[in-house]
Structure formats: structure tokens, C-alpha cells
Amino acid sequence: MSDSKEPRVQPLGLLEEDPTTSGIRLFPRDFQFQQTHGHKSSTGCLGHGPLVLQLLSFALLAGVLVAILVQVYKVPSSLSQEQSEQDVIYQNLTQLKAAVGELSEKSKLQEIYQELTQLKAAVGELPEKSKQQEIYQELTQLKASVGELPEKSQLQEIYQELTRLKAAVGELPEESRLQEIYQELTRLKAAVGELPEKSRLQEIYQELTRLKAAVGELPEKSRLQEIYQELTRLKAAVGELPEKSKLQEIYQELTRLKAAVGELPDQSKQQQIYQELTDLKTAFERLCCRCPKDWTFFQGNCYFMSNSQRNWHDSVTACQEVGAQLVVIKSAEEQNFLQLQTSRSNRFSWMGLSDLNQEGTWQWVDGSPLSSSFQRYWNSGEPNNSGDEDCAEFSGSGWNDNRCNVDNYWICKKPIACFRDE
């Protein structure tokens, strides 16, 4: 056997402490692998385990650091890209704003209008082509008809003349003349279809002017209303030009009407006749008609103003006992006459008016309702139904509603009694 000794293998001596340092140092010899034989090889492999773990840890740490650095470098690049995109958007908005600002120009408005027109046609709001043509033709015909009418000022003047003619209405001429005028108007209505042509309008206007000058007073009011309605219907029938034969017939009727009106008595003569009839009637009433003692005569009626006082119901009875009524007012003249009598004597006096049957609905004792034209005779703020006031009285310069159980003076009314000496 040889005396030389083989060096001992120290499997766990990979790391040795350097006495000059406080840390652990690696020596080159530690990385030299020594060949072992037999059971010593497994022990050497176990000695290299911690080194492998350390290497893996260093590799993982390095990978994490690299990833962080990459992200850090990417952030400025992303921010720069976003900034550039914002710049592009801002530029687009600026251009859009400038384009909108130019919309007010006439050319842009025209373009918009054309687009809207095309849109309307596309939506289907316009009628089909055949209907458009029909509508256009109707409008053309309407325009042509309107163009043939006389000018507005002349039509207005004609209407004013007819209004003045109506205002000139007075009383009834003799019956034969009335019948003749009525027949002429009837023929005129039947003959008229539509207005004559514009050239004839002036002639008709002149005829109406002469007719107005010749008219003194038209027939009585009831007949006048009928004639006015006929003239209104005649106006409604106005349209376009009638045929020549009908036009001739219209002129003939106007001529007859003018002749009939020309024979009427003038207005001054009619007024004189009316005045004479009024005077004659008054004289007859004074000579042949009498009111009872203590009664006052006015316009064909007799009035009794009491000197004592009663409530409203007893006043009604008192008038009935003498063949009269608690006064029922029929005209403004009668109201003025009675108001003057009561105001002179400074007496509150009952009249035959109440709303006993229905609150707010005033009615005379003869059953007739209070005319709306008489509402102006109430004193200011009356009737107010203060304290169940249902009966009307003369009070001062007007009417007042008062409680029916209050005692007042009263006024009776009855027609005058006329007689003949035998």
C-alpha cells in the first residue's frame, strides 16, 4: 500500500467564510466538480441544490425589473399618442364650428331649403302628380274668378249705400204701392243669378244711387225685415257673369223698381202726414176719452199714484179692484214719464215687477219677461237681492229691489175709456 493519502472530499464546503469580510464569498474552487465514485455521487448532487434556487430567484427578479422598465417607457408613448388624437378631434370640432357659422349665408339657406323640399317630397306629403295638376287648375280658375270681381273700394261703397238705404226706412206708403214694390223685389230676386260683368257694374251702381235719392221711407218694419233678408240672400247669390238674356232681365226689373219708388211721396210730406195723424189722435182722446178722477193720462193710458202705502202683494190687489194692474212698463217714454212722477214727489213706489217665481228672473204681473233693454234702469249695484229682496220699486232716478213685505206707495195702470155721445 502507498503511504500517500488522497485529499478528502468535503461536499458541504462549497461556501466558506472569508475572515476579512463579514459576508459570504464564493471561491473558484467551489465551482469545480470532483468526480466521485460509488455512494458519494448522490451526496454531491444534494450539495448543489441551494445554488440552483438562488440562480432561479435572480432570474425571476431580473424578469420583473425588465417588465417594469418596459411599462415605464410605454407610458410616455401612450400619453403622446392620446395627445395627438385630442389635437385631431379639436381640429375637427373647429372646422365643424366654422362650417356651422357659414350656414346663415344665403347660399347655404337655399341649399337647406332645397334639401327640405326634397325631404318633403320623399316623405310623401305631396299629393300625387295628377292631384297636383287638378289643384293647380282649381287655383288658376279661382284666381281668374277673383280677377273679374269689381275692386274692393267700389264694393264697399255699394254696401255703404245699401246700409244708408236701410237707415232711411220710415213708414208704410199706400198699400197698392207696397204691393208693387214687393212684387218688383220678388222679380228681381228671381231674375238675379250672379253679378254682371265689371263694365255693367258702374251702371248698376248709378241706378242704386238714384234709387237711394228717390227713396223717402220704405214699408213698415215687419215688411222691411223681409225685404232686407231678400237683399241679403241676393248678395249671397253673387258669383260670376250671368248670361246676356238674364242680364237684360235684371236691368228691366231695376227700371220697374226705380219707376215704382219714384212715385212714392217725398219724406217731408210723409212726416207732415204722420204729425197730423198724431195730433188728430191726441185731440180725439182728449175729446172722446176720459180717465177717472184722480188718474193721470199719458199716451192712451190712465195712471193712479196712490197716497197711501201697502206691501207689494196688497198693491197688486188694490189695482185689480179698480180694473187695473200694478204698472207694467212697455216703453222708454212710459218709463221716463213714471220716473219723473215718482222723483218729483220723492216717493218709493211699487211697480208690477218681481222675481218671486225664480230668483234672478224678473217678470211683470202680466206674465211678460223683463226686456234686456230695460236693464239700464236699475240703480247702480241693483238688483242685489240683499235680505231676500224680490219686488221692484221706483227709487230716486231708477229702480231698486226691495223686500215685498215693505209698505210703499203704488202705481196702477189701465187703458183710457173712450165713448161716443148718442
Curated annotation (Swiss-Prot):
A motif (Endocytosis signal) lies at residues 14-15. Residues 297-413 form the C-type lectin domain. Ca(2+) binds at residues 382, 384, 386, 389, 400-401. Keywords: Adaptive immunity, Calcium, Disulfide bond, Endocytosis, Glycoprotein, Immunity, Innate immunity, Lectin, Mannose-binding, Membrane, Metal-binding, Receptor, Repeat, Signal-anchor, Transmembrane, Transmembrane helix. The keyword Zinc does not apply. SMART domains: CLECT. It comes from the Eukaryota. GO terms for molecular function: D-mannose binding; metal ion binding. Homotetramer. Sequence repeats lie at residues 108-130, 131-151, 154-176, 177-199, 200-222, 223-245, 246-268, 269-291. GO terms for biological process: adaptive immune response; endocytosis; innate immune response. This is C-type lectin domain family 4 member M. It is a single-pass type II membrane protein. The keyword Cell membrane does not apply. It is found in: Membrane. Glycans are attached at residues 92, 384. CDD domains: CLECT_DC-SIGN_like. The tandem repeat domain, also called neck domain, mediates oligomerization. Its main location: membrane. It holds the Pfam family Lectin_C. Residues 1-49 are cytoplasmic. Residues 71-422 are extracellular. Residues 108-292 are annotated as: 8 X approximate tandem repeats. GO terms for cellular component: membrane. It comes from Symphalangus syndactylus. Probable pathogen-recognition receptor involved in peripheral immune surveillance in liver. May mediate the endocytosis of pathogens which are subsequently degraded in lysosomal compartments. Probably recognizes in a calcium-dependent manner high mannose N-linked oligosaccharides in a variety of pathogen antigens. Is a receptor for ICAM3, probably by binding to mannose-like carbohydrates. The lineage of its organism: Eukaryota, Metazoa, Chordata, Craniata, Vertebrata. The chain crosses the membrane at residues 50-70.
